[in-house]
Curated annotation (Swiss-Prot):
Disruption phenotype: With the exception of OpS5, disables the expression of other genes associated with oosporein biosynthesis.
CDD domains the record matches: fungal_TF_MHR, GAL4
Disordered, as annotated region: 16-39, 139-167, 501-528
Cell compartments where the protein resides: Nucleus
Stretches with biased composition (Low complexity): 20-34
Predominant place of localization: nucleus
Annotated protein name in UniProt: Oosporein cluster regulator OpS3
Length: 741
């Protein structure tokens, strides 16, 4: 969330002159006394969270904080003082906490980095204004008061006795540690949360251009014919639609088969939907480096062609009148645009677009229970797109450490109905079996959304170390966080059979019941904990389609990443409150999950290519690496932990090395991982405890590779080949026949 230091201004800098007949000293004293009543903050908590206009009467958070909601359409006045550039701000940041009693200058930045939204990769592009800006004259002593939403950065002098604390010093030192690894931490990121998000694409491209590895390419303006566009639409449907099912397959087939050629180039909502799918399909082709070959043009002209179709979809949404009825296709277009930025690892833009989509869905009453007179198909479509958009908003909020637009109190929409947790009968066709699996996937994803939304509402996960240190509600927050982690682990253990990985299959017990064969992190002991979770033994199943295996892996990664993001602040708090057992428990669990995520991804990338087109897995890698960096910074790792850390970093380097050749974001993360691995080796005495895995030999025969990769590496546990090919196997083992094409 967004926090400011609510301090009385000691020496207010003013550009005006004192009144006639009044001394400067008297003027300064009067200013100090009237400062608390003259501060105005232009955003209440409700408006920041919902991104909507304040109502005529004060909203509930404002009544609780003794403040008043004010709606105004006036433009914010210009700042009296000269704005400070972010570059000068980062260069002049104090390296150590000043002495008590002195004052430091603290920047107050706006909630939105810019009053307009642009999609240009270099900062250009036509603006997309954020409509209905809100303002709130809030009481200056409220804990959640927000600074002005204007684009200016003002100065405010704050006593260091109210600012400096052991927790604050630890946070700043951790940021200096990250800067030493090559990670640029801005002042805004340092104030909002301790763990910076994934480096933006612009930063990665700058470093890449400097290194001369990936040449910059202009935006392509060519227009594909219908056959070429249809290929990328199908590529999107095969790669991303199973993970983000925006519509049934029958409706998708009817959309492009009947009206596709007519909608080509039309500024309609159906044409915008096809353009959004085309942009994501080209983006998937670019992720594998095959975009130029498919487009039959030069690599320079093809590398950025997807942005053209993104803009066409965006322009249709921007030209729509907000007074018109919001249809299902409109929310689907918002989902596609948000996915486009997520695939490009532009979390800031995805966060803003998800917020706009949630607000548009509120205007169309998608968050409410469908009307009784609505048909079953329309009601299902509305529920599905609402929960999918809600998850995208919650996911972006979780990654950036910002409030979500979806709130528990304003979300009465029921989750998607879950079919019976069993397999579809053998006589059902392939489409019916796939839709049944997608229904299970939607239900599990909506369950994850509800758990995370409740956690973000109840647990101050992203509050600063200064507020956590010495807080009276710290014990309640940690108890609520522990309950959230247990809910996430229980939900992961209760996944339906279709979405279970092979290593997580249920085995019968002596009393006839079933249980998971793997332990969870909450049930594992603290001392000498090894990476034995499910992620470290990830396995693929022979005969299953790629879309189903992606669903299994991405779901497990989402659950592990949510637990990791919720628990990783305790790694830094462990340095301050080392005697607290609950903080130590969460810190050790975060370390174990970070190693598990990297081990799981390394296992998948070394055996298959089913995740090659999904660049959205990069935030999972980044969160694990930055958690390991915090653990290294705290310096509480023994020899066994250092061995696990080096093994995890070697896994990360093995994953990022091929990705860095085609993805600028991966290159930046790869460079930071190299610096962190060097720090670990230096701390371990200069020796690499865990050697990098050797590359496969070219002399390996085809039969040996087939046997090792397809059978020996894919099955774990007690399952063998004879049992898999037996006619009397269980439904779980016979899953490949149900989904054979």
């Amino acid at each position: 969330m967004f926090y400011t230091f609510n301090a009385v201004m000691t020496d207010v800098v003013s550009a005006g002159r004192p009144a006639r007949g009044q001394s400067t000293t008297t003027r300064s004293r009067n200013t100090q006394q009237s400062a608390p009543t003259s501060q105005n903050f232009r955003a209440c908590r409700r408006c920041r969270q919902h991104r909507i206009k304040c109502s005529e009467k004060p909203c509930e958070p404002c009544r609780a904080n003794n403040s008043k909601c004010v709606w105004t359409e006036e433009k914010p006045t210009a700042a009296v003082l000269t704005p400070i550039s972010p570059a000068n701000l980062a260069a002049n940041r104090p390296m150590m906490a000043p002495a008590a009693g002195s004052t430091i200058t603290k920047p107050i930045a706006s909630h939105y980095a810019s009053p307009t939204y642009t999609d240009g990769e270099d900062g250009g592009g036509e603006p997309w204004p954020l409509q209905h800006p809100c303002s709130c004259a809030q009481h200056p002593n409220t804990p959640n008061s927000c600074p002005s939403q204007s684009g200016d950065i003002r100065q405010q002098q704050i006593p260091c006795s109210q600012h400096a604390s052991p927790a604050s010093n630890a946070s700043k030192t951790f940021h200096q540690f990250l800067e030493g690894l090559g990670m640029a931490v801005t002042a805004e990121e340092g104030e909002l949360h301790q763990f910076p998000p994934l480096p933006s694409a612009e930063e990665g491209k700058t470093s890449t251009a400097a290194a001369g590895l990936l040449p910059s390419a202009p935006t392509a303006s060519e227009t594909l014919n219908w056959d070429g566009q249809l290929y990328f639409v199908r590529l999107f449907w095969m790669s991303l639609a199973p993970l983000f099912p925006i519509m049934p397959e029958s409706e998708f087939e009817a959309l492009y088969a009947a009206d596709g050629p007519y909608l080509l180039g039309q500024r309609t909502i159906e044409g915008a939907l096809i353009n959004g799918m085309t942009a994501l399909g080209i983006q998937c082709a670019e992720a594998t480096g095959s975009g130029a070959r498919i487009l039959s043009c030069s690599p320079t002209a093809a590398s950025r062609s997807s942005i053209e179709y993104f803009r066409r979809c965006r322009d249709v949404l921007r030209d729509q009148d907000t007074s018109t009825t919001t249809c299902v296709h409109t929310i689907r277009c918002y989902i596609l645009l948000t996915l486009y930025h997520l695939q490009a690892n532009q979390l800031e833009k995805a966060y803003y677009l998800a917020g706009l989509g949630v607000r548009r869905a509120h205007m169309g009453r998608f968050h409410l229970t469908p009307a009784a007179h609505s048909s079953a198909r329309v009601a299902d479509d509305r529920i599905r797109v609402w929960w999918l958009l809600s998850w995208l908003d919650v996911y972006c909020s979780l990654q950036l450490g910002r409030p979500a637009a979806v709130q528990r109190s304003s979300n009465p929409c029921p989750p998607p109905s879950s079919p019976p947790m069993r397999f579809t009968p053998m006589h059902a066709d392939v489409v019916s079996r796939k839709e049944a699996s997608l229904d299970n996937y939607r239900f599990v994803l909506s369950k994850l959304t509800m758990i995370v939304v409740e956690a973000l509402d109840d647990v101050p996960v992203f509050q600063s170390l200064e507020e956590m240190h010495g807080s009276s509600t710290a014990g309640q927050s940690m108890a609520r966080l522990s309950e959230t982690i247990r809910q996430l682990e229980t939900a992961l253990d209760e996944l339906p059979e279709q979405l279970l990985t092979r290593h997580g299959s249920r085995t019968p017990t002596n009393n006839g019941q079933t249980h998971r064969s793997r332990p969870t992190c909450s049930t594992m002991p603290h001392t000498n904990r090894q990476v034995t979770s499910s992620a470290s033994s990830a396995a693929l199943t022979v005969g299953l389609p790629d879309w189903l295996q992606r669903q299994r892996l991405i779901l497990e990664l989402h659950y592990l990443d949510a637990c990791l993001v919720l628990q990783r602040p305790f790694v830094l708090w462990k340095q301050i409150c080392s005697s607290d057992a609950s903080i130590t428990k969460h810190a050790e669990s975060a370390f174990s999950r970070a190693c598990s995520v990297l081990s799981m991804l390394h296992s998948i990338y070394s055996r298959s290519d089913i995740l090659d087109r999904l660049t959205m897995v990069l935030p999972f890698i980044w969160n694990a690496i930055i958690t390991i960096a915090a653990y290294v910074f705290v310096g509480s790792a023994d020899d066994d932990k250092k061995t696990q850390l080096l093994k995890a970093m070697n896994n990360a380097l093995a994953i990022l090395e091929p990705l860095a050749r085609i993805n600028p974001d991966s290159l930046k993360v790869y460079q930071i991982s190299q610096a962190l691995a060097a720090e670990l080796r230096e701390a371990s005495g200069g020796t690499d405890v865990v050697a990098m895995p050797p590359p496969p030999s070219a002399a390996t025969s085809t039969s040996t590779t087939f046997t090792d990769d397809l059978f020996k590496s894919t099955f774990t546990g007690s399952l063998d080949l004879d049992e898999f090919l037996n006619d009397e196997v269980t439904m779980t083992d016979d899953f490949s026949e149900l989904y054979s094409f």
